[in-house]
């Protein structure tokens, strides 16, 4: 405990959801919200013996402002922060697994509209959900926080991430693939990574733009795959892939333009 209880704002309980912390920027989510979430995550990570925390963000316009305060909160909690910058969520989880600690926070609005942002959190190797997320709110409400002087370092994790994937995957033949990143975070690495797997890549909306000007970044909805289907047919591609805003959801289209829905993808992966 410390003597700062009167400084901690009352955060909206509605943003502490089942699988993440998420809100509308400027309404239920502000820069100071990010700071205090950093303080709570830092305290919890330290309590579980993990002083090292990795932080990344997606390409949303509110990202730089929020991530700066998140990192400051973690450092003020006494954590050592590895800032991996703009990355897709899978790269953040990879970094949390291979760098010094097993904790990480991804600042992302995922597949939600542009004015949303949020926090996906892993502490000591466990992705937080349900009561674990509520425990962070309880820490803030009871002022159960740590205080320290942590340090921040910038880490370029993508080369190591690419090396791991390319080393693990060998394709039986060269494929022509249309890659629709939906102007999300996957645009910084998905085309290059898939190309490194010996594919011919046709990029579509791969410039990171937090306004998502071409279509909503949710490949789970058929209306967001219209451009991908058209490009696959136009180019005679073998396959089409579409990613959501932070690159942890994928939509798949066959060479004929048919959508492979998630239940069938699950059977293929099994």
Where are these regions (language model features)?
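An N-terminal, well-structured beta->alpha segment
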Residues: 1-70, 76-77, 154-175
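Short, compositionally biased "basic patch" segments
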Residues: 2-23, 124-143, 242-244
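Catalytic cores of large soluble enzymes that bind and process phosphate-bearing ligands
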Residues: 26-33, 58, 62, 66, ...
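Catalytic-loop motifs flanking and including active-site residues across diverse enzymes
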Residues: 33, 37, 66, 88, ...
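Well-ordered alpha-helical segments embedded in enzymatic catalytic cores
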Residues: 36-40, 91, 161-164, 224-227, ...
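N-terminal small/polar loop signature for handling phosphorylated ligands or for N-terminal nucleophile
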Residues: 47, 52-116, 163, 193-253
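Glycine-rich phosphate-binding loop of actin/hexokinase-like ATP-binding domains
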Residues: 105, 118-133, 248-270
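Gly/Ser/Thr-enriched, mixed-charge loops and adjacent short helices
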Residues: 117-235
């Amino acid at each position: 405990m410390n003597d700062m209880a009167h400084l901690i704002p009352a955060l909206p309980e509605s943003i502490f959801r089942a699988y993440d912390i998420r809100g509308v920027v400027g309404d239920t989510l502000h820069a100071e919200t990010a700071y205090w979430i950093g303080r709570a995550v830092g305290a919890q990570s330290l309590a579980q013996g993990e002083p090292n925390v990795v932080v990344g963000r997606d390409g949303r316009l509110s990202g730089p402002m929020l991530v700066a305060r998140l990192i400051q909160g973690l450092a003020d909690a006494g954590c050592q922060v590895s800032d991996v910058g703009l990355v897709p969520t899978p790269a953040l989880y990879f970094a949390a697994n291979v760098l010094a600690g097993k904790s990480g926070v991804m600042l992302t609005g995922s597949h939600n509209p542009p004015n949303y942002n949020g926090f996906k959190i892993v502490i000591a190797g466990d992705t937080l959900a349900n009561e674990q997320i509520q425990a962070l709110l309880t820490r803030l409400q009871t002022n159960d926080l740590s205080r320290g002087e942590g340090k921040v370092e910038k880490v370029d994790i993508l080369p190591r991430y690419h090396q791991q994937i390319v080393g693990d995957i060998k394709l039986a033949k060269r494929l022509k693939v249309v890659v629709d990143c939906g102007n999300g975070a996957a645009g910084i690495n998905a085309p290059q990574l898939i190309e490194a797997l010996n594919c011919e890549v046709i990029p579509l909306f791969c410039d990171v733009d937090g306004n998502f000007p071409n279509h909503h970044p949710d490949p789970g909805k058929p209306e967001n795959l219209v451009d991908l289907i058209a490009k696959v047919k136009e180019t005679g591609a073998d396959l089409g892939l579409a990613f959501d805003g932070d690159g942890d959801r994928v939509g798949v289209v066959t060479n004929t333009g048919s959508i492979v829905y998630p239940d069938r993808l699950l059977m293929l992966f099994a």
